[in-house]
Amino acid sequence: MTEFLPFVARHIGPRHEDERAMLAALGLPSMETLITQAVPASIRLNRALNLPAALSEADALAELGTIMGRNVVKKSFIGAGYHGVHTPPVIQRNLFENPAWYTAYTPYQSEISQGRLELLFHFQTLVAELTGLPVACASLLDEATAVAEAIGVACRHHRDKRSRILLAGELHPQTVDVVNTRAEPLGWEIATGSDVDDNTAAIVVPWPDTRGVYGDFAKVIADAKAKGALVIAVADPLALTIMEAPARWGADMAVGSMQRYGVPMGFGGPHAAYLAVSEALTRIIPGRIVGQSVDAHGRAAYRLALQTREQHIRRDKATSNICTAQALLANMAAAFAIWHGPAGLQAIATRVAALAARFAAALKAAGVEIAGESLFDTVTAKVPGKAAAIAAEADKGGRLIRIIDADTVGVTFDETSTEEDLTALASLFGAKLVGGDTVLVPGKERGEGFLTQEVFHSHRSETEMMRFLRRLADKDLALDRAMIPLGSCTMKLNAAAEMMPVSWNTVANLHPFAPAEQVQGYAKMTSDLEAWLCEITGFAGVSLQPNAGSQGEYAGLMAIRHYHQARGQGHRNICLIPSSAHGTNPASASMAGMSVVVVNCRPDGDIDIDDLKAKAEKHRDNLAAFMITYPSTYGVFEEGIKAFCEIVHDNGGQVYFDGANLNALVGLARPADIGADVCHMNLHKTFCIPHGGGGPGVGPIGVAKHLVPYLPGHVEAGSEHAVAAAQFGSASILVITWMYIRMMGGAGLKKATEAAILNANYIAHRLKGVYPILYTGAHDRVAHECIVDTRVLKDSAGITVEDVAKRLIDYGFHAPTMSWPVAGTLMIEPTESEPKLEIDRLCDAMIAIAGEAKKVADGVWPADDNPLANAPHTASDTLATEWKHPYTREEAVFPGGAFDPTAKYWPPVSRVDNVGGDRNLICSCPPVAAYG
């Protein structure tokens, strides 16, 4: 028997004796017998993974510390969208480093997500107040992709009858790179200048531009309005605290990065981007929107609003493929604004602007030409032939400035900049400090008040802020409280040792465009990770750039697109997708310029191979790709997977392997060996990056050798086709996955996969006598998840799947995935991290709920007044003086007989009114004046 280091045993939930008991319940003598039954022999990897031997937590931390110690952290004045920040310790400790915040899932179940939904609501309010636009979403992935998404909104607004996009000023180079990538498959024409014609869907106005200059865009904005083109502002949110809101000068949309609201640079990410729009555009914007509704008793409650726009419902017709966004970072930004309040934010912005103004005045006095007259934080200087030399001198002094070209440098100030920095930087240009007034755009300063809502004025002391964040966290159910058995979501342990390095100075405080010789730690860490992921998946190359699983899908499909184009087969545009696929699949295919053809599934859940063959042959001249999730979205290892791949290859297509269920494969089988050409890996599922309540995620792609040349590039690396603003995407959280793999080793990773499969099969076994298990493979086995058919309760007692999901809250659980991939069912994925005790607790709850439904069916409880129909039950409702229900208070909140009251979770609201929330959309808090 393999002996594992302590970390492996701490990561995996079931003890040895638990494993034996679970196998015995399944009637199996060993784990190998289970794996032989569940996983087709034709795909098994019959050797150990070639990975470094596992290290202990202490040794892994020491090794990573040595590696990241190769990074040289210097003070950055590079700017270009990334800024030094002071993360308030009260936010770092109580939010960023708090598992109550970072282990939560996307808040689909609103009753157990009120804390983070409330803070995201404040984020939307913050953005709406800064921009003057009424509707904001609860974050996008980064500024560059936010600009691309806003352009997509403009084209949808014009019903795709306009395709020209005018970049009216100088955007950051990485933004232009991402926009160009997005434009090519969608047929957008990207132009620069000031000429607005009748085909112009939108103009994009940087505010300020990449040089730090506020240009005069009055005429081009007026022309856009006259021609019916939308105006998109790319606006710095710190500058907006002292600058006029974009809506006031004609913007229909505003986007930008919230990074400088307390979130470290992290060598490129993760950071939350914002998008705000006029009311007319509300229903066509991407991303999550948090709305305010009421619960069953009329209390205010938050929820995700207008979800019919999104990929999990609209599929290839969705507004975007975005699924996981940057909720944790958006919440940090909101907390930063709450902590400082409007006066504090303006003080930071005013100081930054004053530093830049004094620097500009000093350079002018020394005869140095600078760009523009109106500035905020950045001064761009002309230094003919001296850019490299000046930057080198700055470097010697521990400061990094931006080399724009051989004759031009940029210097950007932020909240960490000091008087000493100002003096030292001026001296590089032979300049001495002189007086200088802040040089904002005349007439464009913010005149009106903002953030008058009470929440932005009530938490000035650390005691108040600490308790505010604690009260919000207490409203939510995250992994620090209980199992989150969401199918297809892999809510496994995010170990403390994996998380610790994210806060290290050598990880958090590097600019993504720092000189290569100063980021050798990142170079080594990412190189290790790429090699390990190649070995785990069998691919020849990996890109770590995609900063979400959806972006990994997009990057992989774009690699396929560029491969076909390079071979003179750019006409290949048909993407075959099973009817059971994740909604991001068709949405990503559409964004990559492909037309979706749906492949049918058989009644047993498997892909209909005859239908696949017929459609592949029908479209053989234009077949680009086939997207498949494996194990299937039904939680089964399909025996025909290799045959599926052969059919696609025989007809000229490439196989895209959706890695959402990779947690059932690691160490047992590899996508490339099965026949895949490209696969995205959700590091926030399989490889332990936490979900953060809806992000961050990381979705790197692995590709076969012939696709390596078509991996995403980056303008900083002298290549094209970037899918994210930074070359390594959300680079700082890659250390989490590095730590996980380094502490598990190849044998530990395989053991984790086996445990995940055991846990799922044990659940299926325990529940199959009460609920049908919809799909199973050979030997009646499932993979790492199973679909429980709760429709039997609907048939017998009128109890819906939503009733079951909400009743599980009373038992102390986050509901499994509801009504996907099959309506009216629950999909359960326990992961390897859950102990047998917790798994049994979930099974006991599900069995008890079936018993409660029987009481309804038998007439003991009325169909409209029973613990399931009224779930969840809050403390205030349960303690009310009057109790008119036909069941007891104890049955309401301490159900199941053996329920442990010490583990009780109390939801803050009862069932939320979703329909009413969409009919009466409220997605930001009105200013105080609105109540006058």
UniProtKB/Swiss-Prot annotation:
Originating species: Brucella melitensis biotype 1 (strain ATCC 23456 / CCUG 17765 / NCTC 10094 / 16M)
UniProt similarity note: Belongs to the GcvP family.
Coiled-coil region(s): none
Listed name of the protein: Glycine dehydrogenase (decarboxylating)
Top-level lineage group: Bacteria
A single cellular component GO annotation: glycine cleavage complex
Modified residues (N6-(pyridoxal phosphate)lysine): 685
Pfam families linked to this entry: GcvP2_C (PF21478), GDC-P (PF02347)
EC main group: oxidoreductase
Quaternary structure and partners: The glycine cleavage system is composed of four proteins: P, T, L and H.
HAMAP family listed in its UniProt record: GcvP
One of the protein's GO biological processes: glycine decarboxylation via glycine cleavage system
Gene Ontology terms for molecular function: glycine binding; glycine dehydrogenase (decarboxylating) activity; pyridoxal phosphate binding
Function: The glycine cleavage system catalyzes the degradation of glycine. The P protein binds the alpha-amino group of glycine through its pyridoxal phosphate cofactor; CO(2) is released and the remaining methylamine moiety is then transferred to the lipoamide cofactor of the H protein.
Reaction catalysed by this enzyme: N(6)-[(R)-lipoyl]-L-lysyl-[glycine-cleavage complex H protein] + glycine + H(+) = N(6)-[(R)-S(8)-aminomethyldihydrolipoyl]-L-lysyl-[glycine-cleavage complex H protein] + CO2
Keywords, alphabetical: Oxidoreductase, Pyridoxal phosphate
Keyword Oxidoreductase: yes
